[in-house]
Design a protein with these regions (language model features):
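Short S/T/G/P-rich N-terminal loop/turn motif that feeds into the first structured element of a domain
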Residues: 1-225
Length: 225
C-alpha cells in the first residue's frame, strides 16, 4: 500500500475544492451587521454570477489569535483562480471600504484544500452544526498509508456499534504553500451535535495516536449560502 491510495477522489460531485478565509471582527461588528454583510455578499455573488457551491461561517470553540471566525467556501476547482482574480481586481477594494468596519477578510492567508471524502455522507442541519479538524504529523518509522486500515475500521465501527458518528469524513490535502501544508494529514469531520463529536473524536484519537502526533480544533458551523 502506498500514499497515493490516500488521495483517491470518492466524490460523485465533480472536481471541487474547499477553502477557509480567516476573518477579523471590526469596530462595528455585531450580529445584525454580520447578517447585513452576509446578505450583501450573497447579493454580490449573484449579481456577478460567481458559482460558489457553498459558504459557511465557522466560529472557533476556543479563541484563536489568528482569526475571529472562518469564512468557508466550496468552489469548482476550475473556477477558483478566476473568481479570486476578478474579486481582487474589481471588487475587493470597494468591499473593504463598505464592510471593513464590520469584518476584515484576510485574503492573503487563505487555507485551500482538495477534499477526499471518506465513508458515507449523512443528512445534517446546516444551520447549526460542528466541524473538527485533526492536524496529524507522522511519528518516526510510520507511513501515511497506515491511516487507511484505521479509517476502514472506524467506518465499520460506526456502522456496527450504532455510534452516531460524523455526517462527513474527509482527508484534506493543501493546494498551495500555506502554513497548514506542514502536516502529513488533516482529518476533517462534521457532526450533528457535540455528543457525536466527543464520542467519535475519542475513537479517532485513540486509533491514530500510534501513527501520528495530533492536535485538534473545533468550530460551530452555519451555512450562509
Amino acid at each position: 500500500m502506498n500514499n497515493s491510495e490516500i488521495w483517491v477522489d470518492n466524490s460523485d460531485h465533480g472536481d471541487w475544492m474547499v477553502e477557509f478565509i480567516p476573518c477579523k471582527k471590526g469596530q462595528n461588528f455585531s450580529r445584525d451587521n454580520l447578517l447585513d454583510l452576509i446578505s450583501c455578499w450573497n447579493k454580490k455573488i449573484d449579481e456577478e454570477a460567481y458559482e460558489i457551491l457553498m459558504a459557511v461561517i465557522l466560529q472557533p470553540k476556543e479563541k484563536s489569535e489568528e482569526y475571529d471566525f472562518l469564512w468557508q467556501l466550496e468552489l469548482w476547482t476550475k473556477d477558483r483562480d478566476i473568481f479570486w482574480t476578478e474579486w481582487r481586481n474589481n471588487h475587493e477594494n470597494s468591499w473593504n471600504e463598505d464592510f471593513g468596519s464590520i469584518a476584515t477578510f484576510l485574503t492573503d492567508e487563505i487555507f485551500d484544500f482538495k477534499v477526499y471524502l471518506r465513508g458515507e455522507l449523512k443528512p445534517l442541519d446546516e444551520s447549526n452544526y460542528h466541524q473538527e479538524f485533526k492536524y496529524c504529523s507522522l511519528k518516526k518509522d510510520h507511513n501515511l498509508s497506515e491511516v487507511l486500515d484505521f479509517e476502514n475500521n472506524y467506518q465499520n465501527l460506526i456502522s456496527t456499534k450504532k455510534i452516531k458518528g460524523s455526517t462527513l469524513t474527509a482527508f484534506l490535502k493543501p493546494l498551495s504553500d500555506h502554513k497548514l501544508n506542514n502536516f502529513d494529514l488533516i482529518w476533517h469531520s462534521c457532526y450533528e451535535d457535540l455528543d457525536a463529536l466527543d464520542e467519535s473524536s475519542k475513537i479517532i484519537d485513540e486509533g491514530l495516536s500510534s501513527i501520528f502526533d495530533i492536535h485538534s480544533t473545533q468550530h460551530v458551523g452555519k451555512r450562509i449560502r
